[in-house]
Every structure is written in structure tokens, then in C-alpha cells.
């Protein structure tokens, strides 16, 4: 109550911020006559003047009014477009490192030019991030004349470019590209052979277009550069054939009613006891499992994983919903955007299982060479901001994870769109009949209609229904993405009907009456008369559509996220145009079936609705919204869970990448090598000669063999001890360090210090890269199995942090050990040998950098498993107790506690 009164008196925080920025707009508007009076050359010269003032110590904030006024004036001259005051407010929001929520059609691309220009003045580069290559190249070409008029350079990055082309694009003042490409270039740069091979500069400032799509929807998908792994792909086919013989439980409550239980919410499969026994029998008959072997024995866990993947592929992943088959390949369909994600693959054998199900070529699994997440990549920028039409519903997540505030920017003209109440039907059949009738009604009135669907399957089903009812229409989904811009450009014509999956066509406005510019572009060198005729015809159509009520948007079902529903609604009523929206639902829709309340179902059954009758009630709308909030909350928890796990890897990644950069930048690593050599040798001696111990506790024969084997040191330790009765530990250490130092000195003298420094650098980089790749593999294995700790009453997150730290400590130790071992053994004789080593390393890295394959991790399932196991452990991260080691710490050179007789590092402490 008190909050409401205060808000009425002083306004909300958003309103106060808008008011503050509107005052700044007055200062910008006051400068307009001054800049209008300047000629083109004087206006362009302002850029150089601003840069000089920045170098002299003036801040960007101080320059803002003049810089924005310059951009506005340049835009008027070059593009014939003047920034509105609300667009100035949007530009200030972006400059301050926030998210600007602007409704569809409010000119987000033009808003971006203000903050881009101001921040590009620093010379550190500005990245404009888009969701696909089409939008990146379109926006770059559209805005290039404006930026070049102002004396700024513009570059575009896309996959397939050479390193030189990319380097040139990043060297520009402004660089356009997709989130994937920026992220992959960051990973590739950290696999570069030399500093000169890197393409990116420092990550200074980024503006993300459709920020919700990239930072929220894409947050589950890690960026992974991977290489193929040797494996038996025929295994997937054989398991796929066996999985057909397993039957789903007819009653979820009765595990004896089938072989496995499906969990549709989490897309998981659980074998029943009956199914487990049946599967073992099938595997034995197929000679894939020994007669006395168990499916759950350690060596057969991979087999069990294959079976789970095959069952999930067959029963939970559906063609034309989760993926399509195109040109003999299984291509994932993004659940949020409805777009195909070429090159992306599900992990953990799931993609291969789907390929086996569809009978297409099975591609090999891959090994991670480098990885990060969009969440952690974009947090590397000094300043980050974004634009979207729908961010307010996710404001909490933007604030908590990225530290970004959301500002809702007022529309230039009032919104007059009418959002009708949802209509809920008992069955899907009745719902689709009602949609067809609504489409017919709106077409007869001369209104264009956009029908939004959640899947390709639904869009194609609706298309068939429309064919049966002889309704002309266009379909826009992942299968027709090439013609996307053309279809969207004419979707606003009178009576036009367009069926589109979730977000297809995002970034392109539906102009009422169609787009005359697209028609003109299709003509070869059109005359002025032809253009005028096109404009006149468009104006007539435009006026007719306005009079009929504007664009009508139909939602064929509610999405899991209210934000995606709002994006669909936002296609209508742009820039103050009239428009309307309505969602048609049924109790058979996924959202209602999996998350909706039983109360709605009971109410509808109690009402005894006739076939074709719908319910339109606030209680139903509230139930739908509650279901959506429930799903949004669950998805937020999953993304947060993933981020908390990746933060551990991210800290390690930063350390390794920083060390790698230091090695690349160094010309002389001899002092580092000497320091590492002393440390590694001291640790080796301590394993056999414990510090401050009696001579009786020494293992000199063991140390002698170890030094010969590992460090090429042939020293008669036993003889030294026998010949000198005063032989003590300090003397032993001193002599061994002298011998080892002498070995390195003689190697350097044999080839010359310069060649030795080059060789040391290549060895250091090769060991670092090899061990890091192995470490990533071990981190993957650790993360996938960590949820099981919850069932042992341990907190999986704390366990993961502890074990990841131990793995990282082992990684650093192994890197040092390997570097010294290799340098101790290898003798360089000629310069050609080092040249050849450098050539081989460069070729390997170029090959690996070329294989940038985004893997669509099945992260949701693993994150949910972790959350579930944390509940099982009975504690959360907040109340977790400090983790203490159960037994004494085992050194790398100690005997392994498993009793094998091997050293720990050659047994359970071995990383590969």
C-alpha cells in the first residue's frame, strides 16, 4: 500500500530515469539548429574534434549531448531519418550499460547508432551482436553510409572468413556479427599459434540486438570447439534396433506394466526392473554383453548410456518438432526461435541416436578442445548493453546474472493494439477449427493475419487445413528460412495469411500494406515513374489495411515463456498502428497438459461444453499465467545452475588463457623454466627423500631410477651415499640441482641460446594445450556424474568445486612436470628441427581452429539432475558445510591408496 502511494507521488524508478533522460534530450534538441547550419565537411570533422577532446581527458558522458546531436543531423542528411526524443532516451540507456526495451517498429537499429558512435570514439572498437548472419550483414550495410559519413569504419564477421579478413573486421571502429561468431573467435584466439594470429582486440563494448534471445534463450547452449573421437558408430545402429523391442509402461504408477518410464518434462527415460532384465537378455542374445556381465558394471556403463540415448531419441525427440532431416542430416530446431541450428549437435551420444533412428549417416562423437558459455563470454566485456522488444519479464535474471538493468522506453506514439482474452477449447481439433474460422473472418474484412505456432509440425498441420479450406497462405518455418525476408516483407498486404514458427522473421517489421521497397528491389533498374506507381499502390493498400483494423495476430498455443508470447503480440500495432491479437488454447496443448492445473480441466468438464464451444474466463488466463511462471522459474533455476557450474570452469579458463598469452608474448622463458625445474625436481626428491628425515627412510635406488626415467639424470646416488659417511639431505638436493642445471646448460650451449629459447616456448605451448584439452574432458565427465553425490547426502555443487579445484591443481602440476621431462630428454641439434616443430604445431592448431562445432549440450537434463540430487542431499549451497578430506592427501609420487603398487600419478591420479 505504502509503495503504491510513494509510486503515485514520485513515479516508478523507470519513470524517474526516463524523466532524467528527457531533460538531457532538451540539451540535445537545443544543439540541433547549430549543427544544421554546418556543411557536410564541418559535421564530419566533429568526430576528430571529439577524439581530441577525449584524449585531453574529457569524458564520454560530457560529450554525449553533442555526439548524439551530430548523429541525429548526419542521419537526417544521409538516410533521411531523424531520431525521435524517445530514441535518444534509448541511446542513453544503451550508453549507460543497460537493456532498452523498445516495442516492435520503434526503430531499435537507429537507436543503436547513437551509443555505437559515442563509444566508438574511444578507438577501442564496438561490437554489434545479432542473432543471425542475415541481420548482421543487413544492419551493417544499412548503417554503413551513416558511420562512414562520420569518419568511422565498419566491418562484418561471419563464418568462413580467413584470419586476415577477420582481423581487418575487428580492427574497424564498429564490428557487426553473430553471438556465435564473436564467441568462437574468442575461443579460436586462445588456440592461436602466436599473438599475431589472434583476430580480436580487447573486449571493450558490445550492444546485443534481441538481447533476450541471446542472453536468456541461448544461455543453455555452450560454445564448444571440438574434434572427432575414434569410436564404433555401428554400435548406435545395433542399439537402435534393440530399443524398438522395449515397451513404455502403460501405467506410470505401475513399474511392472512396461520396460521404461518416460518423463516428458525433463526429457528423461528410466528403465524399470523388468526393462533392465529384458535389456540384459537382448544384449546377451546380440553378443553385446557377456553371459555373466551386468549392465551396471563399470565397463558396461557406456552401453547403458547408449540405450538411454536410443530410448530418448525414439520417444522424446520428434521429427519436425525438435529437429528436421535435411540433405541426409539431422538438424536441431531451436525450441525458442523455430530456426534450424546448422552445425549444432546434441551431446552424450543423443545426436547419433537420433541419426540412427532416422537412418541417416551417423557422425562420430567429438572431444572438446575449447569451450565457454554465452553467459561467461559476454561478461568479459568492459561494458555491455542490449535492445529487445521484450525484456521486462526477465528483468530479475538480467540483473542477477549480468548486472544489467532493464529500462522500458516509452513508445513514440500511443499503443492502440487490442489484446483479446484467450479462448480455451477441450481438444486440439476444436481449437484448430476455431483458428481457421477466425482467419476466414479477418481475411473477409481485408486484414492481414499472422498465425504463430510453437513447432514446424503445427505450422505444417495448419497449412494443410488452410489448403483444405482454400485459404491462400505462406508458411515460414525452419524449412523455408531462405525466403524468410521476402515472405515477411509482404505479410502486411490486405488479406495476406502467414503462418510462422515462434520467432521466424524476427528483426524484420511487418509493414501494413506490404513493402514497396522490396518490390522495387526486385525490378531491374526501376524508373522514377515505376517507383512512384509502387508507392501509390502501397499507400492505397496501407490505408485499406488501417481502415480494416490493421494486422491480426493469432497464437496457436501459449509458449512456455510469457516473453515469447509478448514477442508474437508485438508484431501487431507497431508505431501506433491499429492491430489485434488472440491466443487459441486447448487442454491438449503441452503447456496445459504438463504444467496447467487440474482445476481448469475440472471446470471445463463441469460446464459440459458442446463441441466447438470455448471458455473465456479470467480464472483460465490466470491458470495459464501461473503455469508459465512455473516454467519460467524452473528454466531460470536451470540457467543459474549451469552458470554456477561454468563459473568454476571459467575461473580456470581465465588462468590458463592468461598463462598462454604470457607464454606467447615472451621471447625468453629461461627464467620461468629454471624456476619450474627447481620446483619439479624438489618435489620429485621429496617423494623418495622426505624432508628432514633420517637416512634410513630414504629410497635412493627408487629415486635414482625415477630421475633416469623422467629427467634423463644418470646419477649414482647409492654410490654417493656409500662413499661419503657425512652425506646428508641438503648435500643430496644441492648436487642433484647442480647436475640438472648443468644438463640444461649443456643443451643450450650445443645449439645456442636463441634456438633453445624458441624450442622451450614451443614445448611449453604444446604441453599447455594438450593438458588443457585433457582437463576439459575430465571436467565434462565430472559434471555429468556429479549429481549422483546428492544421493550420498553430499552437496553436488560443493563436491564439484572441490574436485574441480583438485583436478586443476593436478593440471598445473602435470604441465610443469611434462615441460621439464620433455626438455630434459630432447636434444635439439639443428634449427630445421625447431622450424619443423613450429610448422607442425601451427598446422595442428589451424586444423583444430577450423573445426568450430557448436554442441547443443543436453544441459537442461544435467542441471535438473543436479537440482534434484541437491534436494536428495538435504542441503542447498547456502547452508552447505565446509568440505573436509576423508583421508590424508596423496602426493603425485606416493603409492596409490588402491593397493596396485603403482605411483598415484600413474594410477588413480592419472589424468588421461
Swiss-Prot record:
Residues noted as binding ATP in the record, renumbered to the chain: 87, 105-109, 509
Locations listed in the record: Cell inner membrane; Cytoplasm
Residue stretches in coiled coil: none
Necessary cofactors: Zn(2+)
GO annotation, biological process: intracellular protein transmembrane transport; protein import; protein targeting; protein transport by the Sec complex
Manner of cofactor binding, per the entry note: May bind 1 zinc ion per subunit.
SUPFAM superfamilies linked: Helical scaffold and wing domains of SecA, P-loop containing nucleoside triphosphate hydrolases, Pre-protein crosslinking domain of SecA
Name of the protein this chain belongs to: Protein translocase subunit SecA
UniProt source species: Chromohalobacter salexigens (strain ATCC BAA-138 / DSM 3043 / CIP 106854 / NCIMB 13768 / 1H11)
Amino acid at each position: 500500500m505504502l509503495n503504491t502511494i510513494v509510486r503515485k507521488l514520485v513515479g516508478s524508478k523507470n519513470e524517474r530515469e526516463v524523466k532524467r533522460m528527457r531533460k538531457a534530450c532538451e540539451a540535445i534538441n537545443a544543439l540541433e539548429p547549430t549543427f544544421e547550419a554546418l556543411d557536410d565537411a564541418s559535421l564530419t570533422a566533429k568526430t576528430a574534434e571529439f577524439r581530441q577532446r577525449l584524449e585531453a581527458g574529457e569524458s564520454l558522458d560530457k560529450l554525449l549531448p553533442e555526439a548524439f546531436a551530430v548523429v541525429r543531423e548526419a542521419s537526417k542528411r544521409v538516410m533521411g531519418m531523424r531520431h525521435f526524443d524517445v530514441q535518444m532516451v534509448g541511446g542513453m540507456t544503451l550508453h549507460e550499460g543497460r537493456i532498452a526495451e523498445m516495442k516492435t517498429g520503434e526503430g531499435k537499429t537507429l537507436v543503436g547508432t547513437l551509443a555505437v558512435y559515442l563509444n566508438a570514439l574511444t578507438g577501442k572498437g564496438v561490437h554489434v551482436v545479432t542473432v543471425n548472419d542475415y541481420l548482421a550483414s543487413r544492419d551493417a550495410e544499412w548503417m554503413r553510409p551513416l558511420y562512414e559519413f562520420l569518419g568511422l569504419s565498419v566491418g562484418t564477421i561471419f563464418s568462413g572468413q580467413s584470419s586476415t579478413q577477420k582481423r581487418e573486421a575487428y580492427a574497424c571502429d564498429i564490428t557487426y556479427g553473430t553471438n556465435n561468431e564473436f564467441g568462437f573467435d574468442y575461443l579460436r584466439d586462445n588456440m592461436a599459434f602466436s599473438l599475431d594470429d589472434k583476430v580480436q582486440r580487447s573486449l571493450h563494448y558490445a550492444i546485443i540486438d534481441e538481447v533476450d534471445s541471446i542472453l536468456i534463450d541461448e544461455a543453455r547452449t555452450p560454445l564448444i570447439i571440438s574434434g572427432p573421437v575414434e569410436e564404433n558408430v555401428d554400435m548406435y545402429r545395433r542399439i537402435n534396433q534393440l530399443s524398438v523391442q522395449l515397451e513404455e509402461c502403460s501405467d506410470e504408477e505401475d513399474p511392472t506394466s512396461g520396460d521404461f518410464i518416460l518423463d516428458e518434462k525433463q526429457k528423461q527415460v528410466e528403465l524399470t526392473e523388468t526393462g533392465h532384465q529384458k535389456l540384459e537378455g537382448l544384449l546377451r542374445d546380440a553378443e553385446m554383453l557377456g553371459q555373466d556381465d551386468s549392465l551396471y558394471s563399470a565397463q558396461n556403463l557406456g552401453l547403458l548410456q547408449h540405450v538411454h540415448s536410443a530410448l530418448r531419441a525414439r520417444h522424446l525427440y520428434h521429427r519436425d518438432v525438435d529437429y528436421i532431416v535435411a540433405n541426409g542430416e539431422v538438424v536441431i530446431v531451436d525450441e525458442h526461435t523455430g530456426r534450424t541450428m546448422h552445425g549444432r549437435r546434441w551431446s552424450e551420444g543423443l545426436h547419433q541416436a537420433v541419426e540412427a533412428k532416422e537412418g541417416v549417416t551417423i557422425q562420430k562423437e567429438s572431444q572438446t578442445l575449447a569451450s565457454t558459455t554465452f553467459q561467461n563470454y559476454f561478461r568479459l566485456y568492459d561494458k555491455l548493453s542490449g535492445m529487445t522488444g521484450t525484456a521486462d519479464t526477465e528483468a530479475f535474471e538480467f540483473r542477477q546474472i549480468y548486472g544489467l538493468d532493464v529500462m522500458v522506453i516509452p513508445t513514440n506514439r500511443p499503443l492502440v493494439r487490442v489484446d483479446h482474452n484467450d479462448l480455451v477449447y477441450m481438444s486440439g481439433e476444436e481449437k484448430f477449427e476455431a483458428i481457421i474460422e477466425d482467419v476466414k473472418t479477418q481475411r473477409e474484412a481485408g486484414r492481414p493475419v499472422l498465425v504463430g505456432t510453437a513447432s514446424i509440425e503445427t505450422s505444417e498441420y495448419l497449412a494443410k487445413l488452410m489448403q483444405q479450406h482454400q485459404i491462400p497462405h505462406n508458411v515460414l518455418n525452419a524449412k523455408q528460412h531462405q525466403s524468410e525476408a521476402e515472405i515477411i516483407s509482404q505479410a502486411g498486404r490486405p488479406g495476406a495469411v502467414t503462418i510462422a514458427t515462434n520467432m521466424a522473421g524476427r528483426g524484420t517489421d511487418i509493414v501494413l500494406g506490404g513493402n514497396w521497397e522490396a518490390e522495387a528491389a526486385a525490378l531491374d533498374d526501376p524508373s522514377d515513374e515505376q517507383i512512384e506507381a509502387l508507392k501509390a499502390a502501397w499507400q492505397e493498400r496501407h490505408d485499406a489495411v488501417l481502415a480494416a483494423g490493421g494486422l491480426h495476430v493469432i497464437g496457436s498455443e501459449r509458449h512456455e515463456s510469457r516473453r515469447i508470447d509478448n514477442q508474437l503480440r508485438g508484431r501487431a500495432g507497431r508505431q501506433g498502428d491499429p492491430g489485434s491479437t488472440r491466443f487459441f488454447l486447448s487442454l491438449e496443448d503441452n503447456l496445459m497438459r504438463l504444467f496447467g492445473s487440474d482445476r481448469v480441466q475440472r471446470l471445463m468438464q463441469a460446464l459440459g461444453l458442446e463441441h466447438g464451444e470455448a471458455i473465456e474466463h479470467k480464472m483460465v488466463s490466470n491458470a495459464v499465467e501461473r503455469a508459465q511462471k512455473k516454467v519460467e522459474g524452473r528454466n531460470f533455476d536451470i540457467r543459474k545452475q549451469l552458470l554456477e557450474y561454468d563459473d568454476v570452469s571459467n575461473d580456470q579458463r581465465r588462468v590458463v588463457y592468461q598463462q598462454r598469452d604470457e607464454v606467447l608474448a615472451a621471447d625468453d622463458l629461461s627464467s620461468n623454466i629454471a624456476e619450474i625445474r627447481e620446483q619439479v625436481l624438489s618435489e620429485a626428491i621429496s617423494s623418495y627423500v622426505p624432508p628432514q628425515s633420517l637416512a634410513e627412510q630414504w629410497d635412493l635406488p627408487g629415486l635414482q631410477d625415477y630421475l633416469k626415467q623422467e629427467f634423463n639424470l644418470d646419477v649414482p646416488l647409492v654410490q654417493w651415499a656409500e662413499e661419503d659417511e657425512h652425506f646428508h639431505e641438503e648435500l643430496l638436493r644441492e648436487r642433484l640441482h647442480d647436475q640438472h642445471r648443468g644438463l640444461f646448460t649443456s643443451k643450450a650451449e650445443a645449439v645456442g641460446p636463441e634456438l633453445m629459447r624458441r624450442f622451450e616456448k614451443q614445448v611449453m605451448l604444446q604441453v599447455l594445450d594438450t593438458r588443457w584439452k585433457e582437463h576439459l574432458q575430465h571436467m565434462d565427465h565430472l559434471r555429468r556424474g556429479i549429481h549422483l553425490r546428492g544421493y550420498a547426502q553430499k552437496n553436488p555443487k560443493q563436491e564439484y568445486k572441490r574436485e574441480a579445484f583438485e583436478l586443476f591443481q593436478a593440471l598445473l602440476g602435470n604441465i610443469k612436470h611434462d615441460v621439464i621431462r620433455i626438455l630434459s630428454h630432447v636434444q635439439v641439434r639443428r634449427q630445421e628441427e625447431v622450424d619443423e616443430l613450429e610448422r607442425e604445431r601451427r598446422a595442428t592448431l589451424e586444423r583444430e581452429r577450423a573445426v568450430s562445432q557448436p554442441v547443443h549440450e543436453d544441459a537442461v537434463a544435467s542441471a535438473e539432475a543436479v537440482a534434484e540430487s541437491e534436494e536428495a542431499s538435504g542441503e542447498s549451497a547456502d547452508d552447505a558445510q565446509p568440505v573436509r578430506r576423508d583421508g590424508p592427501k596423496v602426493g603425485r609420487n606416493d603409492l596409490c591408496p588402491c593397493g596396485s603398487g603403482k605411483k598415484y600419478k600413474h594410477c588413480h591420479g592419472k589424468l588421461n
